[in-house]
Each structure stands twice: as structure tokens, then as C-alpha cells.
Amino acid sequence: MKMPVIEKIEQLHDEMVGWRRDLHAHPELGFTESRTSTFIQERLQSFAVDEIQTFTGTGVVGVIHGRDGDAAIGLRADIDALPIAEESGVPYASTKAGVMHACGHDGHTAMLLGAAKYLAATRNFKGTVYLIFQPAEEIGGARQVVADGLFDRFPMLRVFGMHNFPSMPVGEFHWRNGPIMAAANFFEIRITGRGAHGAQPHYGIDPIVAGSSLVSALQSIVSRTIDPYQAAVVTIGSFQAGMAANAIPAEAVLKGTARWLDERVGETIQQSIRRIAKCVSESYGASAEVEMHMVAPTTINDEAAMSLARNAATAVAGAAGVVEMVQPVMGGEDFAYMLGVKQGAYIMLGAKRSDSVNPMLHHPSFDFNDAILSTGAAYWTKLVEQQLAV
């Protein structure tokens, strides 16, 4: 027999699907989510939430007061899209060239809106819930959100986050105490050589040759510098140089990402990237400049908050549907900035499709699995009703 909260949430399923697909068709990149922000505010207003406030440009917080009580918690959903050209072929595909919801933030937003509608109508809790619709997750926007004083404006005991994962069985909640997602660092290496005619390479300093050696040399960081028992990743995702087949360019640019769980490992990786880039480039007579951008630190769950999250997940999916993760995920999540200053927990919600086509996150053919909308919204509502119980 289904719990009443789940039955009521399921009645909102078709409405959540409509919201999700509208958002999917109109994706917006980080800190430019103006239409998305307006969409969220209009829905919250129609639900008669107590307050609607904006923050950090396009961010939105909906405030719902329950019955008497001073306690408060926050529920966070990310709202931004990615600079990826969509290839899903769905009728509601992106209408914006080169931009799509390839990470499911359209679904995250729809689930939190569904929870908002239920909570505003029932108010079966004591205290206050803050519905946090956060911009720019893909580029580390939570850092600015925290710096702008989100938790000063909206004081709360704990904050919770959730993400869909198409690699996990649909409807299952996956959890882990401590580190659950890796720190994410982006880096750019600019190698400067000297241009020359392709038939006269001796007059130049070839940054492509230097860069090619550098790509290989960087692989030694994880295999020869990091303890094998520590998780770490160094990936080069972009190598750009030159335009002509018969010309040696003056410059080559490599872009990549590094991931780690332990901060000491992260320091070693960053120092190694700088050292190897300098030494390899100079060995070819070139020079290298390295720029690094920290997207997010390691996402670390608080054990007590995670216990509360597990209880809510169990109420929705049953004990068999709540699975402890053996390993963290090496993807990054800027919710880590919120967990760095506020007790809270981050949980995964399985979204694997039953058919053979099941694109992963950030794939051009990815489309959020609408089958989990009710599950995610029910989780949010149970989290509120259990922690702020009447």
C-alpha cells in the first residue's frame, strides 16, 4: 500500500512532466537562466508559497512556513544547462542551438517544484522550508551563492541536494557517508613556441610536438605520483593548435580536468601539472603557462544528515531501494560549497532506462527519465515532514 504523500505526489506527475519538458526545450547556461528563473517564480507564486526571493542574479528561493516552529531546512535543485548540441531527437528538444539540458537539471527543477506545490498545499510540518533553485552548477556557481550570503539571508539547520544518475537502477536511492563526489578542477596549458613553414621546421619551435609529449607525460601523475589506494583522475579533453597543414603554429592550447577526493592528493596533482608542463615545454625550447580553475571541492556528506536523508528515501523506496555506495563518484558537484559551511547530505536517484538506449550524463542524446519525477518529489516532501515533524 502506498503512503498518502506518495499518492498525492503521483497526482502531480503529468504536471511535473510538462514543466520538465518546457524547461528542457528552453535551456540556459549558468548565470543566464533568466527565462528559467521567471518560470520558477511564476510557478511558486501560483502555489501560494509565503515568499519568493532572488539571489545571485538568476537564483530563486521559495519560502514555505509550516505550523509553529523555528527549525528550518533547505532543499536545493540546480537549474542551468550545458553548452552541448542536442541529439536526443525528442519532440521537446532544445530550441537553442548548442545548448541543452544534458545533466537533468530540468528534471531536478521540476521535482523540487512538485514538492513545493505539495508542501504549500498541505503544510504538514513545523518550521520553515527553503526551496533553493541554484544557478550555474556546471561552472561552480554555488561558490558565489555562498559568498553572496545565501545562508545568512535564509538561516537553516541543514541543506540537502539530489542528482539523477542514469547508470543506477531507476527509482533506487544511492547514498554514502563522507566523500560522495570528487573535487573538480579545470586547467588550461598554453604552450608558446615559434611559428615556421612546415617544410622548414628547424626555423621554428613546434608547440604541437611539445604538447603531444606533454599529454603523455601528464598521464604519469596518477600512475607514478599518487598512492594507488587514492582515487585520482587527470584527463586532457582538448588540444588546439594551428589552422594550416603546411605551417607550424606559434602556440598550442591544452585543456583538461583533474579530480580527487583527498585534498593532499589534489595539491600534489596541481603541483605536478605545473611542473611537468614547464619542464616538458622547455625541453623542446618552448614555454608554458598554466591556469587552473577550481569548480568544486570534494562533496562530503555529514553522517547525521545522511541518516535523515536515508530515512526519507526508505519511506519512499523501501529498504531494498536504498543502497549504500561502495565507491564515490569521480564527477564533481558544486553543492560541496554548501556542505562546506552547512550540515547536509547529497543523495543519488537512479534513472536508468529499461530500453537499450540509456545515454549517460553530458551526452548529446541524454534526456532526463520522467519516470523518477514523482519519486524525487516524494523524497523531498518526506525529508521535510520527517525532520520538521508536527
PLM-predicted stretches and their roles:
Residues H26, H202-V209, E263-Q270:
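Active-site pocket-shaping loop/turn-to-helix segments
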Residues K2-H101, A110-F125:
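Acidic/His- and Gly-rich active-site-bordering loop/insert found
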Residues S212-V390:
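Metal-dependent amide/peptide-bond hydrolase catalytic core
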Residues V61, L82-I84, S88-M100, D106-G107, ...:
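Histidine/acidic-residue-rich, glycine-tolerant segments that coordinate divalent metal ions
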Residues R76, A85, F187, Y346-A351:
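Non-cysteine beta-strand/loop elements that form the S-adenosyl-L-methionine
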Residues L23, G62, L75, H105, ...:
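Divalent metal-coordination and catalytic microenvironments
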Residues I52-Q53, N177-M181, Q327-V329, Y337:
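Short Gly/Pro-enriched turn/cap motifs at secondary-structure boundaries
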